[in-house]
Structure formats: C-alpha cells, structure tokens
Amino acid sequence: MKKRIIAIFTGNRAEYGLQFPILKAIDNHPELEYRLIVSGAHLDKNFGNTLDEITKDGFHISAEVKIEMDASSLEANVQAIGTGILSIGKVLNKIKPDMIVVYADRFEGFSAVIAATQLNIPTAHVEGGDLTEGGAL
C-alpha cells in the first residue's frame, strides 16, 4: 500500500512545540509519511536558530524555506508573503503531499496555505482564528 504523504509546515519554535505530537503520530503510523517544511524564525540566528532543535528531536527536514522577517513596513510584509508563496509552492509541487498541516496564523503559514490552495492540496489549519495581535490569517 502506498503511504499518504502529509506535509507539515512550521515557522517558529512555538508552532513546532505544538506540532511535535502530530509529527510523532505521523512518523509512527504505518500508512503515513511526513514531509517537514521549515521556515521563518527556525532559520534565523536572531531567533535562536531552532532548526537544530528539530534535528536533535530526530525529525528529517524535507525543505528549508527562507522568508525574510523584516517587519519594518507593511510593504516588507507583502514582499515576504509573496516570496513565501513562490518558494513554498515550489517545494509543495516537488514533494506532492496528499495534504498539508499549518499551525496558527503567522504570515509564513499564510504563504503556505495560499500555495497549497492553488495547488489543490487539502489543508489542515490547526488553531487558526485564535485572537492574536499582528496575526496574518
């Protein structure tokens, strides 16, 4: 039987901590495989370069997507989201997941959701819509 591929998108330490049990469950399921897409603060030394945390936990990273974290202007946010859509879209087109899991409401996740939607990839948006200050979705 062909395993179903579940893409997991994470953009920061807080999301990753909450996604950890989802990743473990997929990893332990005989009919599922995960493809971990890491972006945002995970790749930024100013935020602790938490990419190392993920690899120490034993998870394989399928793709690293650099998205500039310049919040100096609204235009910079628009450019970051646009770049994210293009970059994440390329990754999703390559790995061809059966679905993607995106956590919360940050702009990196927003980029992932837009890319997935345009590629007809079903999306599981976990804890979206919670009241946040500065959220993107």
Where are these regions (language model features)?
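Basic/polar N-terminal segments that are highly enriched at the extreme N-terminus
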Residues: 1-3
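Active-site and donor-binding regions of nucleotide-sugar-utilizing enzymes
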Residues: 5-12, 17-27, 68-137
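Generic secondary-structure signature for well-ordered alpha-helical cores
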Residues: 28-31, 59-60, 93
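Conserved nucleotide-sugar phosphate-binding/catalytic loop shared by glycosyltransferases and other
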Residues: 33-80, 87
